[in-house]
Amino acid sequence: MKKGNMIYEGKAKKIFATDNPDLVIQEFKDDASAFNALKKGTILGKGVVNNEVSCHLFSHLAGLGIENHFVEKLSEREMLCKKLEIIKAEVVMRNIAAGSLVKRYGLQEAQVLPFPIAELYLKDDALGDPLMNDAHAVAMGIASAEEIQFVKQEASKVNAALQVFFLERGLKLVDFKLEFGRHNGKILLGDEISPDTCRLWDAETMKKLDKDRFRFDLGDVEEAYIEVRHRVLGN
């Protein structure tokens, strides 16, 4: 597989073309950002951890029948993926109150929600990725009502599967962000699943093992990412 020109660079990843128009290479960076890029920094080795964790979790989900863009791991920082037309609606699944949910509604942090909540956010850095509802997404032409319904159903399946997966490894899946895209007439799960996109707490101590350690200057950021990698991969 020949690596071509870079076709996109985001805050945490670069996307490269390949000699196959249906496939791209996703490369993970050590760059870190928070609060809509108002805070920036570097987490040493983050790209390696996020690539390895994402590869493992995408493979696990595929084995459960949840289709996604992952094809194969190419290197410690790179994965080969199906090229998606990204849907500009991010899905956040929430199981435990944390982050913006606490701030927005005055909930107690760590309050277990009676059922998982699915939220939609407009994928737009300039606007700060605002919260939106299904009607907004359809009215703005982001996706059809049927596509939004499918994306939410898939997100719920991913949530159920990952809650079990992480709990078996001593981690609570507090909340996480998912992105989806279109590929050859199908909607597939894309992007990444990692400590960058998931809030993960130790099931016993409730220690935060994710990007919140960077966001709020909690220290031991690299160690937290390595711990998640160790638990996910088992080595």
UniProtKB/Swiss-Prot annotation:
The keyword ATP-binding applies. It comes from the Bacteria. GO terms for molecular function: ATP binding; phosphoribosylaminoimidazolesuccinocarboxamide synthase activity. One of its GO terms (biological process) is cobalamin biosynthetic process. Pfam families: SAICAR_synt. CDD domains: SAICAR_synt_PurC. PROSITE patterns: SAICAR_SYNTHETASE_2. PANTHER family: MULTIFUNCTIONAL PROTEIN ADE2, SI:DKEY-6E2.2. This is Phosphoribosylaminoimidazole-succinocarboxamide synthase. It comes from Chloroherpeton thalassium (strain ATCC 35110 / GB-78). The lineage of its organism: Bacteria, Pseudomonadati, Chlorobiota, Chlorobiia, Chlorobiales.
